[in-house]
Amino acid sequence: VTHLFKTQNHIFTTDDLKLTLQNLGIKKGDILYIHSEIFNFGIPMINLHDLQKNIIDCFFEIIGNEGTLIMPTFTYSFCDNKVYDKLNSKTRIGVLNEFFRKLPGVKRTNDPLFSFAVKGAKEKLFLKDTDSCFGKNSVFDVLTQQNAKLVLFGGRYVDHSYIHYIEEHMKVSYRFYKNFSGEIIDENGNKTNKDIMYYCRHLDINSETTIESVLKMLVQDNNIQSENFANAEISIIDIKRFFETGTKVLAKNEKALLKQENKNAMCIQ
């Protein structure tokens, strides 16, 4: 047993973490898509490298060899006119994600804007090339088909990028397809040119979804379970249900999840 975090009156161990994950219904064979903010938890009791390694190990112990772990490693490279170097382009979101992608056996997807790191029994399903960041065969598409679970590790406000998959599926009018081109360097140092479509926001109109409105939808649908752990929360969301509810809500009113919209627009009838 390894000590992970301490709070004012308690020490949280790897056993505590595994129990918390099991209490959330995580089990052998699960496909987990994890967004994390590990600095929301208590005071680390071991160095950052060991802390991150122990957290990843806990997840794999619960989901087993038959499970699959996925984390976003977004770089937005082509948006910034940069080369996407699969080995060396740092992720812009979260230290745990960056740690995970560098572990032995972890593969990274080819998307030069929204890449993901993946390891596990079903990793091949997630490594397909796609024409559009959030379109057919994208990681979000496969997560939905495979009944994966979204884990918010460190609080409910960690991320809501999955909503963009729903927005693209519904072809909301406040977004549009834009082509991005650039150069990819693969694991072996080979360079290729790549084009990819990204369903971007129209910046001149109200087009920004808020985490609050997405959360409200998930709570109303009873599709977010949370457990307290070391002064923060670990939450789990059923991705397929997220998709089904999100498409219903946007079919009724495509602006329902946007900033400054009518607060009553969010009923799921």
PLM ranges: what are they?
Residues 1-269:
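N-terminal and secondary-structure boundary signal
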